[in-house]
């Protein structure tokens, strides 16, 4: 046929049977990838430390999505929360992966069948005997079925009525578990961090989809609207479908990057804004203050801070710190976290408590500056020692650890103090194993960053695809030079411009 690569899809343009076939094959590829990727991730995933080496540190991409929908157990006998299980049931991680692969195989066979048996009676217009599709009717069917699925997910799966529920956690990502969620019908349901809104919105959107589907099945579009929007053209379907997909991609890129109830930090890692705003640092200080108010010692108050909360307050878990083209998991960057060393408190020789100024997200290097509680600079690590006034040596800075592995240990040696001051720029201090994975010490992004980048990029590409195909279908007559209302027989090759009798070719 001699088609260029960018025109190959014209072979299914007027062939409904094979158009269906290639879409079934596409579903087979998507489902097969999902199942295969899940099995690969399960093969390399280490479930032994859900606190310091969670799935998002290990670069898992599909496991978090299974987990947020209620899958927590493996046929390997482990649970995502760190315990062991004896009877995980069929809907384990491996069970879901296997179901996708089986479904992929069935779709593969169905695609082959529809490719071979393309000339079905159902695709023929009984009046003309030519292949045609009743696109408004098909739209109604799909809208109705999508509405049923959407309603069913919200009313049964999320609520636990017939299903496991979804992953729900506290605002600091400490107590997450799969549980049933009741729909929230008030204004708070519009808060993106309220899980109840997920149930209520799916129920509402599903109901609307069912009603709209029934409407489009029972009411034919007016002729002028049908012609104006080119409802008989399959490229109209392509254009509007691309619009739906790119809109969804933009939305989920936002909910992933900025955070929401659908993207829990226990499964996808914290957001960059939680580092920028000192979100976990404030909660840690609040808990320590509460402990001191209960007459606990500083050491006891810091020892009560959960290691999980301290680990969130570390810049290496900020998804915006990883470079765009640094491949690999976070563990391949700064290493596997082994333990929290504790919280370092710095003091000068007058006994003032000093705070290390933290590194902003988009800095690779940052000066080491120690300020007092009023924000006055009291010490630093100078660039030029000859001109320094606030060096650790001159000010006599010491450091003492509270909580963690170094609880109660203090250092006055300037070199050691400076080492921990530098590390304090990056948040709480952790011991990191860089040997096991040969980690290079350069920060990586989390799956939160990858997902956002991928979906925002493809949404932009698909936006242009929507404009392209929408313009092609709306202005098809202009581009082709054929008046769609032309009743006269058009003989191709007679005119220089097809259908234009004023441009009759000169006989040779």
UniProtKB/Swiss-Prot annotation:
Membrane topology, from the record: Multi-pass membrane protein
Family, similarity comment: Belongs to the PsbB/PsbC family. PsbB subfamily.
Record-given protein name: Photosystem II CP47 reaction center protein
Pfam families assigned: PSII
Function summary: One of the components of the core complex of photosystem II (PSII). It binds chlorophyll and helps catalyze the primary light-induced photochemical processes of PSII. PSII is a light-driven water:plastoquinone oxidoreductase, using light energy to abstract electrons from H(2)O, generating O(2) and a proton gradient subsequently used for ATP formation.
Primary subcellular site in the record, as a coarse category: plastid
Single biological process term from Gene Ontology: photosynthetic electron transport in photosystem II
Cofactor note: Binds multiple chlorophylls. PSII binds additional chlorophylls, carotenoids and specific lipids.
Source organism (scientific name): Oryza sativa subsp. indica (Rice)
Transmembrane segments: 21-36, 101-115, 140-156, 203-218, 237-252, 457-472
Molecular function per GO: chlorophyll binding; electron transporter, transferring electrons within the cyclic electron transport pathway of photosynthesis activity
